[in-house]
Amino acid sequence: MSFIIKCLDCGHNAPYYPTSTNCPKCNSQWREAEYDYEMIGKTLLPKLAGRGNDLWRYKELLPVRNPNISLSLGEGHTPLIRAVNLGMMLGCPNIFIKDERQGPTASFKDRQAAVTIAALKEAGITELVAASTGNVAISYSAYASRAGMKLWAFVTSLVPSVKMREIALYGSQVIKITGSYDQCKQVAAEFARQRRLYLDMGARTITSIEAMKTIAFEISEQLTNIHGPGENAPWRTPDWYVQAISGGMGPLGVYKGFREMQQMGWVDRIPAFAPIQAEGCAPMVVSWKKGLDKAETISSPKTRIETLATGDPGRSYEFLKKYVDSTNGAFESVSDEDAFRAMHVLAKMEGISAEPAAAVAFAGLFKLIRAGIIKPSDTVVVNCTGHTMPAEPGVLGDNWSRDIKFPSTMETPQEGLLAALTQVAPERFPKIVIVEDTMEARRLIRRILQSQGNFTIMEAENGRAGLELIQRELPDLVVLDLMMPEMDGFAVIEALRANPETAVIPIIVATAKELTPDEKNRLGGHIQALMQKGDFLNDEFLEEVKSLIK
C-alpha cells in the first residue's frame, strides 16, 4: 500500500515506521496517515462486493503494507441495528446502534489492537506496552498472543479483577497501579522508555486512529444498504454520530473516516459529532461550554465509570473541538446515574447489554433529544462501544434476584415447591393496567415501565375491556388513553369513580391531543397525572409511576 505520514503541526511528510513516534522535522507527536485518495476513491468501491466482511475490506486505506490474514480474529463489520423501541420512546425513529460489542473481545478497541498488532508484526516488533482501564488491554492481549508478542499491561487498581484475570489469561504481564488513569499512563510511558519498548500512545498512535476510521466506513456502507445512496454521492451518512469519550480517540478516528470518504467523493457531507463524557470527569465538555481552545484538566475524577476517567485530554480536545464546531455538533455530559439508567433502558427495550461507558453515549442521546438539539427527523448513529460482561456491581441494585431455599431433604414435598414458587409469583409485583387502543402505544408504555422496575402489566385495547379488567384485577395503577372509540377514557374514569373499590386507584392519563378547557374540567380531581404522548421519556412520567405505586 502507498501512504505517507503527515505532521499535523508543520506539514512535513515522512515514511511510516511504527517505532518512529515523532515528526523528524518539528518533533511533534501528532501525525496522521495520508493516501492517494483520488486513485483509491475511483477504484476501491467496485472491489468491495467481492471482499470479506471485516475491517480489512478497506485495506487500501490502512497503514499495513501486507495485511496478514492469519492474525485476524474477525474484527470489524459489526452490525448497525435500528433501535425501533428507543425510537418510539424518543419520538426519533431513525436511531441506529453500531454494535461494537460484537467484536472478538466485545469492544471497539478490537479495531485498534488488530491494526496496531498487524503493523507491529510487519515491522518485526515483539514487545509492547499499553496503559488501560480494561478494554484496550484485553484487546491487545488477545491479538498479541495470536501474533506471538509480549504485552506489558499497566492498569489502575480500580479495573475490575475479572478484567485483570482475562488480560493475564492471554499471557500478558499485568502491572496494577494504585492511582489515577493519567498516572498509570505516566508510569507505563516511563517503563517503555527505560526498556526501549513500543508504547501505545492512544490518540497519538497512528494505527489507532486509522483503525477507528473503519467505523465510519462501515456506518456509511451499512446505511446505504438500508436507505439507499446519498443525494449527491454513492454512500450515505447519518445526521449525527454519538459516542462516549475518555481521551477522545474513537471520534477522532471516526471523523477522519468520514473526512476521507468526502475527499474521495463517496459521501457528500460529514455528520454532526456529539462526544459525551461522564459528569464527574468531563474536562472537554466543561472547556467547550466555556468556549476554551485548550482543555482544563481534572486532577481528581469523581465518576464510578473508571473507563472514562481521563482528567487530562491534552491536544485531543483541540482537534475534537474543531470537529464538533465545524459539524455543528455538541459536547455533552451526563451523570453516572443517568448512564446506569440508560443501561437498563437499552437492555430492557432493545435487548442490548452495554457497559456503563457505552451507556453514557445513550444517556447523552436522551439529553440531546430532550434539549431539541437532535431533531425527530434526524438519522442518528450511537456507538455501543462495549459489552457489560460481567454486569458491574451497583448497576442492578440490591434486589435484582430472588432466592428460593429448599429444605435439606432428599425429596421436596409438593407443598414446599408450590410455596417456594409463590415467592417469585408476579402477583408480588405492583399491578399496572394499560388501557390504550393503539397496539404500538401499548407496547411502548409497557417497555418503558419494564425498563424501570418489576411490574405485573396487563393490557386492554378498548375502554370497555379496560373497565372490566380494572374491576376484576384492582391494580395499583392505571395508565389510560382518553381518545378511544365507543367507550372513551372519560367514560372509564367516571365508571371507576362510581365504584368504591376502584375509586381509589390512581390514574395517569396519556393523550396525543391538546385538551380543551371543558375536557380538563371533566378530569379535574379524578386523575393523578396528565401526560402527552411522545414525552414518555420525561422523568415526570416515571417519577409519577414510582410515587403512585408505593
Stretches with model-predicted labels:
Residues 459-468, 489:
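Helix N-cap/capping motif at the beta->alpha junctions
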Residues 436:
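Conserved acidic carboxylate
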Residues 510-511, 533:
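Hydrophobic/aromatic residues positioned on beta-strands within the core alpha/beta folds
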Residues 1-422:
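PLP-dependent amino-acid enzyme catalytic core
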Residues 443-451, 521:
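Charged docking surfaces used in two-component/phosphorelay signaling
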Residues 468, 490-503, 522:
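Short amphipathic alpha-helix used as the core "switch/output" element in two-component signaling
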Residues 484:
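Receiver (REC) domain active-site loop signature in two-component systems and cognate sites
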Residues 473-479:
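Active-site beta3 strand of CheY-like receiver
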